UniProtKB/Swiss-Prot annotation:
Organism: Photorhabdus laumondii subsp. laumondii (strain DSM 15139 / CIP 105565 / TT01)
Function field: Modulates the synthesis of GlmS, by affecting the processing and stability of the regulatory small RNA GlmZ. When glucosamine-6-phosphate (GlcN6P) concentrations are high in the cell, RapZ binds GlmZ and targets it to cleavage by RNase E. Consequently, GlmZ is inactivated and unable to activate GlmS synthesis. Under low GlcN6P concentrations, RapZ is sequestered and inactivated by an other regulatory small RNA, GlmY, preventing GlmZ degradation and leading to synthesis of GlmS.
Listed NCBIfam families: PRK05416.1
Superkingdom of source: Bacteria
SUPFAM superfamilies: P-loop containing nucleoside triphosphate hydrolases (SSF52540)
Residues holding ATP: 8-15
Identification of the protein by name: RNase adapter protein RapZ
Length: 283
């Protein structure tokens, strides 16, 4: 397992790096004091999960020896790696001017330029020990995240997770949906007394919907639409694509259609999840 320690000058992109590492499956902690690194690693050791911790100038140890001592106390199962982010002085000044945020050392009555210079001196022990130094001066947020994925995972694109979720319009549209499809026009099993207590996961309901050509046409055209744009979505620096399928109550039609779409894209080797909001509420 890896313990990725992320440091660097303020404004160089530590928060962006931490979010990218979280997307890669790292357990992330922001601004953890150095002396607590062994405690965090021991807590995660049994969970078999890599971790990433950001350290900024505010929680730097008083001496490099404190940092080295903390690393020696890590469990043997963890391999520490130090990532240091930096940027040109003028770039950092511009970024602070654009965001209008205060530098962490500004409370010491220093000008922005002086705070940046002092921070550089304070962080030098970490910079000199870094396994990887990235200059973000000419990088966008997305380019930094992409570089980290390339360096750490050996591939450029993160794997997109497709989420197909069913819902009932009477309960409201999911706020996390990227696409919303309305299937209330499809034949409704609700009007069959035998099917009413069932859900779209049950075979009799699936057989009822499977008999209707319009159901097949909708599923085919929806999956074709998603397939058309999926390559661009996969390169758009996103982790999830959430497709919401809604019917009146979220019990029959939307559940069946969401499952059919999920099965199709799963069979194509995509990373797929399915969930059913109305059914989850009934548990």
């Amino acid at each position: 397992m890896v313990l990725m320690i992320v440091s660097g000058r303020s404004g160089s992109g530590k928060s962006v790096a931490l979010r990218a590492l979280e997307d890669m499956g790292f357990y992330c902690v922001d601004n953890l004091p150095v002396v607590l690194l062994p405690e965090l690693a021991n807590t995660l050791a049994d969970r078999d999960i890599s971790a990433a911790v950001s350290i900024d100038v505010r929680n730097m140890p008083e001496s490099p020896e404190v940092f080295e001592e903390a690393l020696t106390k890590l469990p043997a199962s963890f391999s520490p790696q130090l990532l240091f982010l930096d940027a040109e002085r003028n770039t950092l000044i511009r970024r602070y001017s654009d965001t209008r945020r205060l530098h962490p050392l500004s409370s010491k009555n220093l000008s922005l330029e002086s705070a940046i210079d002092q921070e550089s001196d304070l962080l030098e022990p970490l910079r000199s020990r870094a396994d990887l130094i990235i200059d973000t001066s000419e990088m966008s947020v997305h380019e930094l995240a992409e570089m980290l994925r390339t360096r750490l995972l050996g591939k450029r694109e993160r794997e997109l997770t497709m989420v197909f979720e069913s819902f009932g319009f009477k309960h409201g549209i999911p706020i996390d949906a990227d696409y919303v499809f309305d299937v209330r026009f499809l034949p409704n099993p609700h009007w069959d007394p035998k099917l009413r207590p069932m859900t779209g996961l049950d075979r009799p309901v699936a057989a009822f919907l499977d008999r209707h050509t319009e159901v097949h046409n909708f599923i085919y055209q929806t999956r074709s639409y998603l397939e058309l744009w999926l390559p661009m979505l996969e390169t758009n620096n996103r982790s999830y694509l959430t497709v919401a399928i809604g019917c009146t109550g979220g019990k029959h039609r939307s559940v069946y259609v969401a499952e059919q779409l999920a099965d199709y894209f799963r069979s194509r080797g995509k990373n797929v999840q399915s969930r059913h909001r109305t059914l989850e509420k009934r548990k």
